[in-house]
Amino acid sequence: MSETRTRAHVFVSGTVQGVFYRASTRDAARERGVRGWVRNLDDGRVEAVFEGPESAVDSLIEWCHTGSPDASVSDVSVSYTEPEGIDGFHIRR
């Protein structure tokens, strides 16, 4: 029996832009086999969508609380929905 798949919509606040947070998120997602995307928002936050096995998505969300080496994360907000079948993991502009 395969693990249940999930989709997480994530917003990360703090010093998360200009510190390679998006690229590090992409790399962390690929290491875990998580699909989705990540982008900077005009208000200084980072937004991401993660899809994959629950344990892999949960691991990536936990990673988001620390993020890239130069990041300083103050908050991670997550909501869950049904997966939509995203392919790959991309940085959106």
Curated annotation (Swiss-Prot):
Family the entry assigns:
Belongs to the acylphosphatase family.
Q: Which GO terms describe its molecular function?
A: acylphosphatase activity
**PANTHER family to which the protein is assigned, alphabetical:** ACYLPHOSPHATASE
Active site residues of this protein: R22, N40
Keyword Hydrolase appears in the UniProt entry: yes
**Alphabetic keyword roster:** Hydrolase
Question: What name has this protein been given in UniProt?
Answer: Acylphosphatase
Acylphosphatase-like domain residues are 7-93
Entry's EC annotation: 3.6.1.7
Q: What taxonomic lineage is listed for the species of origin?
A: Archaea, Methanobacteriati, Methanobacteriota, Stenosarchaea group, Halobacteria
Question: Species name for this entry?
Answer: Haloquadratum walsbyi (strain DSM 16790 / HBSQ001)
InterPro entries on file: Acylphosphatase, Acylphosphatase-like_dom, Acylphosphatase-like_dom_sf, Acylphosphatase_CS
Q: Which reaction does it catalyse?
A: an acyl phosphate + H2O = a carboxylate + phosphate + H(+)
